[in-house]
Amino acid sequence: MTFNKKNYEEISSFIKNNAQKPVKIVAVSKNHPLSSIIDALNCGIRIFGENRVQEARGKFQDLKSSHPDTELHLTGPLQTNKVKASLDIFDVFQTLDREKLVREFLKYQNITKRKKFFVQINIGKEKNKSGIMPEEGLEFVNYCINDCGIPVIGLMCIPPQHKTPSPFLLY
């Protein structure tokens, strides 16, 4: 796979001309080779998403040193036994979805408080997807912020594949 500069420029232009509020592009680089990530960096992309701790470490440990303005998001499910390792490489966690995971992050509070978190909501209520159910979302966000001091900055919601997304965007 290679980085598609033309596609990126078209998306950036569309956002610039149509967005009513600031929009940040997160380039999901999972399964992409390092050469594609370097091409993306050379085009100005600085926010990347990865769904595996080991793969992200292999690609970004050196890149983040040479490009300190790079921000790395965890976009896939996180096992509690990988929390400590993930804190070394990721800046933003988009998949906070259960109390056990929150408690594991709290073991490393000095590092956790410098990170950003999104609560993952399973808006399609799909059994095979991660995330908490929509009706539990507010209570879980309050637990994270008020009870645990986790810096939650938003929600990460993905509508089900092969369905019209608009009904799910009401959440």
Predicted regions and their residues:
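Conserved alpha/beta-domain cores
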Residues: M1-Y171
